[in-house]
Amino acid sequence: MPGKKGNMSMAHYVNYGNEKIDFLLPKGWNLISAEDKPPVPGVADSLQEIRRALDHPIGSPKIEDLARPGMEVALLFDDLQRPTPVHLALPEILNRLNRAGIPDNRISGICSLGTHPIPTLEQLKKKVGEEVFSRLQGRIFPHDPHASDNVIIGRTHRGTLVEINPRVAFSDLIIGVGECMPHPTAGFGGGYKIIMPGVCSYRSVASHHFTWMRHRNSKVNLLDGNSFYEEIVDAGRLSRLAFKLDFIINDKKEVIRAFAGNPIAEHREASHYSASLYTIPLSKLADVTITSAFPLEVGVQATKALTMAGFCTRSGGAIIWVAPQKEAGSIMPLIKEMGSSESASDFHRRLIQGDVPDHLKSFGISYIMQVVYFKELAEKFRVVHVTEGLSPEQVKMMKFSYSSRLQEAINQVSEKMPKADVAVFPSGGNIIPEVK
């Protein structure tokens, strides 16, 4: 999808697949940011980085010092939607538990998938690797959020019922492995999210997520005062998660850095480090934001760039969202629901009451939340979607405008907004826009 040049101001670009799209801004548009975060290289030796983190835990004794002979241990790891190098981390953790007197036959592995689809045994084997699959033969389980034997362990201080996987509830020592990345509602992923939503029941996750998803402080790059995050911490504490290993991972799925230790302490440091990599400061809210989904361009992941753009665009402004949508099958149910006349708030109320549309029930709760966010974006902004993978009719069902070319989209918006403060995010899929 090439750019188109005209008699305008200087050229800019966004990343699109393996190419760059050049474009020109109208002369009445004032650029307030066009920062493109450079790629961050991975460490030379991922296993060495894992060992370093485990040898120097933050706010916690080492795993070897937490473990006692006779303990039953639950090792929690994230699902196939995350690039976390579980196959490297788990053998090292198993070896440390062995040295502390806990044999493999007293250790279970649990895939903390939240409400995502349950993986097959072969998919679990791919995630944990041959060695761990063999060592924990018959003791690697996917969490089932709908299981009748999930265990109620209490309520958060705000009243959310916390119901978790029985193998976690009845273990003596619980250790988690995951990834810390910017998260649009929890501030950052990682930490206690391995528990909530990771191993919680569907009704617990629905109660938490649907209740707090639109709170003003439920947003990226905010932990203190973020009710969505604070409820996750409450659930994690109730679960007794003792130790967490979180990774910062780049676009090439390489380990940048690992953090380990107390689930709150290590997550704070991991979040701070992640923010240092991805934050783009803005002096004001933009009238127009031009954002590319790159590098998260596949399926529902492509929506992250649009959500982030909403944080830094003024109400009534415009967002130009650029995404190839070459594998768009996974967002078709979202598009179908967007075609209804129901407002964001009315749809949200349905979810709170447990009335989830039948065609969305097989999807995870985070997917269903996207419908609310998209409806809200369509109500709050003029969104122009630049794509080649969706038809104009499909884009219009989302209440967005369609364009096949970026320069054409800019021209459309500039007709109604000849003067505007503009933010450009060439790689909008992995940024944290922060308005000062």
Regions found by a protein language model. Give the residues of each.
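N-terminal amphipathic/basic leader segments beginning at the initiator methionine
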Residues: 6-53
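N-terminal glycine-/serine-/threonine-rich phosphate-binding loop
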Residues: 33-68, 275-276, 299, 311
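Glycine-rich phosphate/diphosphate-binding loops that line cofactor/substrate pockets in enzymes
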Residues: 58-74, 99-105, 280-287, 313-314, ...
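Short glycine-rich or small-residue beta-strand-to-loop segments that form or flank ligand, phosphate
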Residues: 72-83, 108-115, 289-292
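C-terminal non-catalytic interaction/assembly regions of soluble proteins
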Residues: 98, 304-436
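An acidic, phosphate/nucleotide-engaging active-site surface
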Residues: 119-188
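Internal metal/ion-chelating core segments
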Residues: 170-252
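Membrane-embedded hairpin module used as a gating/binding unit in multi-pass transport
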Residues: 218-296
